[in-house]
A protein has these predicted regions:
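Bimodal "functional hotspot" detector
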Residues: 2-168
Length: 168
C-alpha cells in the first residue's frame, strides 16, 4: 500500500514538473476591441418579400427626423436588395407630416390612406418608423413604439406595433 501511494505521489510530481516546463509563458490581458452587439444600430428600412417583411440595415445613414425616413422608404430597395427579392408595397402617400414623441408616432396624411391598414405596405411604414423612432430617442425600444395613421379623409388607423406585421 505504501509503495503504491509513494509511486502515485512521485508520478504526480513528475507530471507537474513536466507541465511547468513545457515552454508556455504566461501572458497578460489581450485587448480585442468592443464586444459584439446583438442588433445592428442605425436606420433599418423594412421591405416586402415572399416570406413577409424583412429589415434592411442602413448603418451609415444618419437621420434627423421621421419624415426623412419615410422618403428613404418611398425610394424603395436598392439594386442588391431587389436582387435578393425585396420590393416595396408602400403606396404613394401624397402629402404627410410625421411626428414622434416617446413611444408614439403619428403620420398625418393629406387625403385618404390608400391601404387597409393590415397589409405589408402598412407594415413597411410602421416597422420602419418604429425603428427610426428608437434611433432618434435611444430611451425608446422599437417593440414599444405605436404608429397611428391619421388621414384627413377617413378614420384613424392604428395604433399599430411592428410585431403585428412580422411573420413568425
Amino acid at each position: 500500500m505504501k509503495v503504491r501511494r509513494t509511486g502515485a505521489v512521485a508520478a504526480l510530481g513528475i507530471v507537474g514538473i513536466a507541465l511547468m516546463g513545457c515552454g508556455v509563458q504566461p501572458t497578460g490581458v489581450i485587448g480585442a476591441g468592443e464586444p459584439a452587439s446583438g442588433l445592428t444600430r442605425g436606420v433599418r428600412l423594412y421591405f416586402a418579400s415572399d416570406s413577409g417583411l424583412r429589415g434592411v440595415s442602413r448603418p451609415d445613414t444618419e437621420i434627423k427626423n421621421l419624415g426623412a425616413v419615410v422618403k428613404m422608404l418611398a425610394a424603395g430597395p436598392g439594386p442588391a436588395e431587389l436582387r435578393d427579392g425585396l420590393t416595396s408595397l408602400l403606396q404613394q402617400l401624397g402629402g404627410y407630416t410625421v411626428t414622434g414623441t416617446g413611444t408614439q408616432v403619428t403620420v398625418q396624411l393629406d387625403g385618404p390612406y390608400p391601404e387597409s391598414g393590415r397589409d405589408q405596405g402598412t407594415g413597411q411604414l410602421v416597422c420602419t418608423l418604429a425603428r427610426a423612432q428608437s434611433v432618434l430617442d435611444p430611451e425608446v425600444r422599437t417593440d414599444d413604439v405605436e404608429v397611428t395613421l391619421r388621414p384627413s379623409d377617413g378614420a384613424a388607423l392604428g395604433p399599430y406595433r411592428c410585431a403585428e406585421f412580422l411573420n413568425g
